[in-house]
């Protein structure tokens, strides 16, 4: 294939978009895989190709010639895991050598958090595929907490005094770009991606109040 051998999904989103922009700025040619190619960002050295999270001839064609693949997880849905597994199968069948997967902190089969279980099973499918892998286990996104306060400014949740090392989506994208620019350094590794400090929900609420009242 004459298309770039480094491919990225989710480039129209936050983390994938940051990753694509930073790699483009480094001068790396990119194949942007998108369900709607017209929504992919127009960046120097990039080409948008139609691709969805399924194992179809279209998906395999979009992945043909890809050496390194950055897989951002699919949008939340009832069949999210099935889509992930199908996409991993398509990547392996298409000859992808190294897959960098955007996973989640503490992904495990018995995790209380549903999405962490989905990410675990996706990781296991990738390992079983024989492809080289790098798992980026992002913590909760700091940007997510900005949207949580109710009309009275409260963040309600079953967290108690639990702490979370929230990370900005922008920073998660920077980590992904760093890995994709030098993938051999991170082969078959699992990296936890967190913020600089573990905070309680009360502390997060106080920070949001301080920042938003400026």
Predicted regions and their residues:
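Oxidoreductase cofactor-interface core, primarily capturing Rossmann-like NAD(P)-dependent enzymes
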Residues: 1-41, 54-66, 75-85, 89-98, ...
